[in-house]
Amino acid sequence: MSKIRVYKLAKELGKSSKELVNILNDLGVEVSSHMSTVEDETAELVKGMLQEEDKPEEKISKKEPDKKDRKKTKGKKQMTRTATQKEGTEHGQKDTDRREMRVTVNPPLSVKELAEKADIPVNRIIKTLIGLGVMATVNHQIDEEIVKKLIDKMNLKIKISQGEDKEEKPDKVQTDIKDKPEDLELRPPIVTVMGHVDHGKTTLLDVIRETRVAESEAGGITQHIGAYQAVVQNKKITFIDTPGHEAFTAMRARGARLTDIAILVVAADDGVMPQTVEAINHAKAADIPIIVAINKVDKSNAQPDMVKQQLTEHGLVPEDWGGDTICVPISALKKKNIDELLEMVLLVAEMEELKANPDRPAEGVIVESQLDKGRGPVATVLVKNGTLKVGDPILAGYTHGKVRAMINDQGKRIKEALPSTPVEVLGFSDVPAAGDYVQVLEDEKEARAIAEERLQKKQERDLQHDGRISLDGLYQQIKEGGVKELNLIIKGDVHGSIEALRESLVKLSTDEVTVNIIHTGVGAINETDVNLASASNAIIIGFNVRPDSNARKLAEREKVEIKTYRVIYKIIEDLKDAMAGMLEPELKEEVTGRAEVRATFKVPNVGTVAGLYVKEGFINRNNKVRLLRDGVVVYEGDIASLKRFKNDVREVKEGYECGLGIEGYNDIKEGDQIETYTYREIKRTL
């Protein structure tokens, strides 16, 4: 017998999927979501019943008893709960003692650690997580939001730490405003498009912007502010058009959600790639629904079934394969099935029941920020709740201000922004950080006082010993009981090396500390890796790869340790020594200069000479040299020659050009990166 999906039946009946799920459950038909199926016979019965209910005479007589029944049921549930509570208290002091003995946890933490704290088997937690749609292993890191769900679902006798150590970054200011259910209204969903480089994220966003924004705003000029709104079936969808934006991870570090839905773009000819896995991990960690857009299906070598198979290996089972992950085959270039994809976004949003209260002071998130020469500090704010108005006193992280002007994604000045609306805001005292909470307070004086107090506390914290984990201080932190889990992110040049390294490092776990690999990937160390390390208090291990310029700067700012190696056993040795507290004084590598190869020349009897432009530091004739191609180390050796014009020189500084030859190596190509370095002897302290 054929079947029909709930959302399709809801469409035919002119009802929302949520309403139909409730109706079917009331009738005793077991369905869990809009993707569940019902038999045609059941569908016909439901159609007939609803048509009968729609008759004017019977409408009142049928609906009234339903309400009473619901009230009775609610009453019964409340009575049962009260009775249970009474029974519990009659058992004397036992329950009170249990409540008092609640163990405190400080997310993010591993499944194994949570099981130990809660004193329950690990497999019970894993089973419950699967029920919540989270595919996790023993060493999988779970954030605060998921821990809360587990506490509610499993009635765990644990509580989440609210201590000072948790308040590393400024959070929301607590207010007395409570949102009443009757004040809440449906708001547009906020969507992030994620995926691997060159899989079509930008093309998809451009197509949606061109077609849907142009339709809604005739003659409107689209302005790039980091987010925009599209109109589909007279409903708005907010897109964050900076894929893989650091705000996504910055918000996850505080256990909050920036987006409601993630569209994962996977190329049908390429399949699941390292950044695809990275995106899946981020979306799962943030606990948001994923819609997969299988792009480039118009290509002759497209293999959508291969993509679906690969997705199942990462816990995303397509709905046509019996799972609950929506997969839509599209071609962003040829604008094929874009409307169907957007319909699925609206469908998931409907099931999520996204609501906000527009009649309250606004709260939101900084998506992008910059210092504009003419306008001063400018930030794109995504309003999450309330309505942001011109003249509102605002607080965001360590900055404050007053909304002087607001510009929407069409480049028009507006006076107020409703929930889920992205706006460019002028009036901050300083440039806020991406991912900071934005709040409207009573007056500007209060906002200034809180911002100054936060800044002072941050400066005091920075002066104290930094709590970030490093190999040098690892043994001392283990001894003091400060470390129970060593989180690592591994980046390498090839998959085989990464897997070999992963297996070797996990075996180093001891009774005092568990080695937990939270993410692996092929390619150069980037900002996303540093953000993830910052959020998870992890060390980044690079094998035959180096961090890019932005990642290095971010790591310095976030105090994330990046260790790079050429030999696997050296990584294992260092970790063993760090964990055993036997770190010997070592030679520390110091990068002295970075340059770009802009041309190459073949010189008889000499070999290939690279024409360089020095971008950072200086190139010294006596330093070691490293050649990088696409972030991967290709060769390391000595400098054979260094010239300015025709003269041999000892040193060339930043901003100058020079010619450089590498001892015993000629395969230099235009676009390669050159790093020069020296070794400095440093004494390790614990």
UniProtKB/Swiss-Prot annotation:
Put simply, this protein is called Translation initiation factor IF-2
- Identify a single GO molecular function assigned to this protein: GTPase activity
Q: Does the keyword Lipoprotein apply?
A: no
Positions of region (G4): 295-298
What is its biological role?
Answer: One of the essential components for the initiation of protein synthesis. Protects formylmethionyl-tRNA from spontaneous hydrolysis and promotes its binding to the 30S ribosomal subunits. Also involved in the hydrolysis of GTP during the formation of the 70S ribosomal complex.
Spans of biased composition, class Basic and acidic residues? 50-68, 87-99
NCBIfam families given in the database record? IF-2, small_GTP
Report TM segments. Answer: none
Q: Where is this region: Disordered?
A: 35-99
Q: Where is this region: G2?
A: 220-224
